[in-house]
Amino acid sequence: MKFGAIYEEYLREQQDKYLTKCSHVEYKRLKKVLKKCRVGRSLQEDCPNGDQQEGNNESPDICKCNSCTLCDQMFFTELTKEASEIAGCFSSRVQRLLNLHVPSGFLRYIWRVRQCFIDDQQIMVQEGRMLLNYVTMNAIAIRKILKKYDKIHGSVSGRDFKSKMQTDHIELLQSPWLIELGAFHLNCNSSDIDETVGFLKNEFFKNFSCDLTEARPLMTMAISETMKYEYSLTCPICLDTLFNPYALSCGHLFCKGCACGAASVYIFQGVKSAPPEAKCPVCRSDGVFAHAVHMTELDLLIKTRSKDYWRQRLREERNEMVKQSKEYWDSQAMLSMGI
Amino acid sequence: MGSELPAAAPPQPKRSTAAAAVARRRIGRELWQFWLDPPPYCRPGPSPVKDHFHWEVVIDGPAATPYAGGVFPVDVWFPYDYPFRPPKLFFKTKVYHPNIDGKGRMALDIFQDNWSPALTINKLLLCFVSVLFDPLLDRPTNRCIAKQYKHEYEAYEEKARAWTQKHSSTPIVSHYPPYAVIGSTPPAVPHFPATAARRKAAASSASGSVSSSRIPLLMKDESIWRRTMKFFQG
């Protein structure tokens, strides 16, 4: 079965049920544009100059093949728009889902009371799986269409666009929210939940696994037998397993203490209090600390999978925080006294 | 060893024991990684690492350079708030190089403004070997040597070889702890593009009007290691 057919079937089955108002890749339409382009190319190769000119006048829809302006306009602007919409939709939906799973403050008590009457856990797992399918299907669709673009045009524009997507932080399979969703999936799997809930007939998503015992802790997502994505759970600063992880807006993960140290702020002030000129230690992008996200599910996963390590790190961070706050208030007192 | 420079420990700021513990753990991991998979031409020093905050590393002079056959011991000092402040690396012997000063320091911007906590000692040593091979002439520490490198390359090469022979020819045996998993030894084939050989080939292919003592630098032919340096410098 071709991917186009699988994707269409997926859209028919799932888009209406769970992902209303969510954007998706217009795979069929973009494929048609490429088909027109291919026809245009063959026309240009076959016809002499005069005929070709006439052909162009008759059908302005067919792209001028050397520059491929139509393709470029249709493709890359459309794909950028779609990818950013999908990324935005995915992140907001995941955020909403995870806020329900790990509520904080007053919501926690409401949630506990609610759980006495209704068991929402299964619905949440189902929605999590739907979101995973949504993001993987769309990511594969983008990947396939870019491959096709490169094949037809004999160019590397598709590959360049892929790397541009990464720099613009709209690469779907590199999103920290996907890691969060994977952690949520693993956290739910560890509790006793009916595994048959929410599986799709044409499910691409097969397996999410996490190994924290190895020298390099990894989370692996296997979309199919051939496609595997590995996400490192090592902090690039302390070179240890992430503890109390935060994702900066560039997508890089750090421990809270490490991120605060890199941004030269106290731990108790938090990652978001970093100055705007503070740069990501890995990619050196600036202004990435302001929209940092606390990875609660990933933290929960690490907490449950390696308890001793988590406790040890918690003790260390608390000691450091106490020391830092003492230092801070001492300096404030001295400042107020004019010393 | 030849004529060694005094390696005084840089003053350490007062830091909390927790911060020092974090630094010690990170340095321990880096040390293990260094034993496991050292950068090309680098290996551990002769004495065992007793203090995590002070290492000794040996850089073997890369082949096809004036430093070939030389053994360069390097002192590595880590601050107590590492990795939030950069380590200090000093060559313990005299090195005739445009980017190395009289105190054995290599002035690179990744040790000052462009330092990032995500950089590891392996990456820094890779930079060291890279610069040793392919000097950064846009910001030299020693202008006289840089000028000589640009305009009288053969004289520079001769002097650098003589200094290497004089100061850095004593062989050093690396010390590996008994429990360390030692990685593969650096290959004999140079990892870096042979700058000197490339320059000589360019000179021979050029017209006879260019004198051999004034070989122009091939600025267009940017090596992969220069690109690596650019990446590290952001």
Curated annotation (Swiss-Prot), chain A:
Protein name: Probable E3 ubiquitin-protein ligase BAH1-like 1
Gene Ontology MF: a single term: zinc ion binding
SUPFAM superfamilies according to UniProt: RING/U-box (SSF57850)
Catalytic activity: S-ubiquitinyl-[E2 ubiquitin-conjugating enzyme]-L-cysteine + [acceptor protein]-L-lysine = [E2 ubiquitin-conjugating enzyme]-L-cysteine + N(6)-ubiquitinyl-[acceptor protein]-L-lysine
PANTHER family recorded: E3 UBIQUITIN-PROTEIN LIGASE BAH1, E3 UBIQUITIN-PROTEIN LIGASE BAH1-LIKE-RELATED
Family: Belongs to the RING-type zinc finger family.
Note on domains (UniProt): The RING-type zinc finger domain mediates binding to an E2 ubiquitin-conjugating enzyme.
Highest taxon, organism lineage: Eukaryota
PROSITE patterns: SPX, ZF_RING_1, ZF_RING_2
Domain SPX: residue ranges: 1-163
Disulphides: none
GO biological process: protein ubiquitination
